Amino acid sequence: MKGNEAIAHACIRCGADGFFGYPITPQSEIIETLALLKPWETSGMVVLQAESEVAAINMVYGGAGAGKRVITTSSSPGVALMQEGISYMAGAEIPGVIVNVQRGGPGLGTIQPSQSDYFQATRGGGNGDYNVIVLAPASVQEMADFVDLAFNLAFKYRNPAMILSDGVIGQMMEKVVLPPVKPRRTEEEIAKECPWATIGRPKSRPVNIMTSLELKPEVMEARNIALQEKYQKIRDTEVRYEMEQMEDADYVIVAFGSAARIAEKSIENAREQGIKVGLFRPITLWPFPEKELHELAKTKKGILVAEINAGQMVQDVRLAVNGQAPVEHFGRLGGIVPEPEEIVEALKKLIK
């Protein structure tokens, strides 16, 4: 099935309570598949086409604020419209899930795939000092697997989590093993697992207030410090990455998502030409695997960062490597996906 279809099936199977979205290419199959599957008739999951992306993210705010596992999906221009809501969720510590099946920009741009929303996702695209947990799938299987993972991380840390995919992964078809079916949680289970949620106040506890607003500077600073401490805990415990053919590698290609899939073929071609190169694939774009990449760079002659953008993740790679090895970037723009041999040629330039 398509990556987008896998997202839809995974939403139902992981016990999600609600989906709020708005059609936009190249992710429209997600809400279309949910409409065909009619989960409201089986599990009771709500599926609603909102009037806009702004409405959709605020529906996620409300549903997640009540302790529900709710999700929204969109593509780059639509996710741009959601940034205020995502910032509000981070400030109020509300655990929703957002899926971005990226397309090229800026502006309305193109419907072709891109990875140009990396900065927006990993730096916090709205106002304020906050971070969103960002997972980058590189296969249809990971599209399915990362939905439940995103929910688990979001609720573990009371923080928004994003699956940052792109039009290649969303539209391509692969075999996939769907996750096991989990029942939706009961109201009693939600009350036990989410004591912070706004689900009605029993006499045994004070009122739960969920807001990002605080007008006393010293209190607001304390809240920000607490958020930063939480983000550091996430950095310390939730980094995920994958390495391939690194045992004898002199050079490294760093790539995520669909670019990593292309890089795998580039590495195969390069090794046939006698170039010993391996792949480092960040799975969490935030938190970024900077310590792991720092240690790896100590033993390598050079690093090529392959992206479908003008050079975004390469900045995090350079910060992580910190001058221990040369770092160069190769990317294509405007929705053009790089060919494996183009990456090999960029690698040869790095070697020279």
PLM region descriptions:
Residues 1-36:
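N-terminal glycine-rich anion-binding loops that anchor highly charged ligand groups
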Residues 241-276, 280, 286-292:
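Redox- and metal-dependent alpha/beta enzyme cores, enriched for Fe-S-associated oxidoreductases
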Residues 307-352:
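Peripheral docking tails and interdomain loops at the edges
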